[in-house]
Regions:
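Conformational-control "hinges and anchors"
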Residues: 40
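Glycine- and acidic-residue-biased ligand/ion/polar-headgroup-sensing regions
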Residues: 51-71
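A short, N-terminal "cap"/entry segment at the start of jelly-roll beta-barrel domains
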Residues: 1-36, 47-48, 67-69, 75-89, ...
Length: 113
């Protein structure tokens, strides 16, 4: 969120591991971090979901993706990069793998920010 004093507007039921369990799996979690394994099969589109926590995203197997916003609109189409990237909390979105190979990434979410 742009302003940390604003409350998170989405319910916990939209968290990636709840709303999109086929593509998000918890590898490890403690009071400081949550590590997610993110896999999107070829041709699959995730259900809309959020990520309340900021963190680092590391793509292991990049593919071509489509990123959709909260209203279901196409925001961008791109080739995922293997360069580690910082992510702020992500509002409602969905990702579609438009490639012929499996997309695989690790998301390290920081709880104490």
């Amino acid at each position: 969120m742009a302003n940390d004093s604003e409350p998170w507007p989405w319910p916990d039921s939209l968290d990636g591991i709840v709303a999109a369990p086929l593509s998000h799996r918890v590898l490890m979690e403690n009071d400081r971090v949550r590590v997610l394994d993110v896999v999107i099969e070829p041709g699959a589109k995730e259900p809309p979901h959020t990520h309340k926590l900021p963190g680092v995203f590391i793509v292991i197997a990049p593919t071509r993706l489509r990123y959709f916003g909260a209203a279901g609109e196409l925001v961008r189409e791109y080739m995922a990069s293997t360069e580690p990237r910082w992510f702020d909390p992500e509002p409602l979105h969905a990702v579609e793998n438009i490639d012929s190979t499996r997309y695989h990434a690790i998301r390290i979410e920081l709880k104490d920010n």
